[in-house]
């Protein structure tokens, strides 16, 4: 098994900053935006984007934490630990996750969102898009496009959970 670091902490910070600038440019009414991080690492990325938006625009956007486990199509979990402090009805919700792969996580996140309210618009921001979709889903904001083979794995580490910021690719062969 081979592991290769493909994004270091500095590059990750730049990617998050780039996503933040794109959010500012594409959303004329930032005061109508709600950030929704997908647990676990998507929540920490959402907090970093929220912090950058505050630094750049002086805005304190609301942020929620989406638990997709109860909405997945491959397992059943009863407890939903979603935290959404604001009504998302009529809001522009930006889903935030670490890796976009098959699209199934995002489908589950959208199912969770519509159970909470009826957003005006839903867009998607991801740190890494690795391809290999099984569903017709694409990201609106992408930090890094990293094409992979189907046997490779992308591992995102964030300092809040893993003690460091980096993205690695693991080749099991």
Curated annotation (Swiss-Prot):
Keywords from the UniProt entry: Glycosyltransferase, RNA-binding, Transcription, Transcription regulation, Transcription termination, Transferase
Enzyme class: transferase
Record flagged with keyword Signal: no
InterPro entries: PRibTrfase_dom, PRTase-like, PyrR, PyrR_bifunctional
GO molecular function, a single term: RNA binding
Protein EC: 2.4.2.9
Stored CDD domains: PRTases_typeI
Sequence motif PRPP-binding, residues: 93-105
Biological processes, Gene Ontology terms: DNA-templated transcription termination
Catalysed reactions listed for this entry: UMP + diphosphate = 5-phospho-alpha-D-ribose 1-diphosphate + uracil
Function per UniProt: Regulates transcriptional attenuation of the pyrimidine nucleotide (pyr) operon by binding in a uridine-dependent manner to specific sites on pyr mRNA. This disrupts an antiterminator hairpin in the RNA and favors formation of a downstream transcription terminator, leading to a reduced expression of downstream genes. Also displays a weak uracil phosphoribosyltransferase activity which is not physiologically significant.
Family as reported in the entry's similarity comment: Belongs to the purine/pyrimidine phosphoribosyltransferase family. PyrR subfamily.
Subunit (UniProt): Homodimer and homohexamer; in equilibrium.
Protein name, as recorded: Bifunctional protein PyrR
């Amino acid at each position: 098994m081979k592991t290769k670091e493909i994004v270091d902490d500095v590059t990750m910070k730049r990617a998050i900053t780039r996503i933040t600038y794109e959010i500012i440019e594409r959303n004329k009414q930032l005061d109508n935006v709600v950030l929704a991080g997908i647990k676990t690492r998507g929540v920490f990325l959402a907090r970093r984007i929220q912090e950058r938006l505050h630094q750049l625009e002086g805005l304190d956007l609301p942020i929620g934490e989406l638990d997709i486990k109860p909405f997945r199509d491959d397992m059943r979990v009863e407890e939903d630990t979603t935290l959404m402090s604001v009504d998302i009805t009529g809001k522009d919700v930006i889903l935030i996750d670490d890796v976009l792969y098959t699209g199934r996580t995002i489908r589950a996140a959208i199912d969770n969102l519509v159970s909470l309210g009826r957003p005006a618009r839903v867009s998607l921001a991801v740190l890494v898009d690795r391809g290999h979709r099984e569903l017709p889903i694409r990201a609106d904001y992408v930090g890094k496009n990293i094409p992979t083979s189907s046997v490779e794995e992308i591992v995102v580490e964030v300092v809040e959970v893993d003690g460091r910021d980096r993205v690695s690719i693991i080749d099991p062969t």
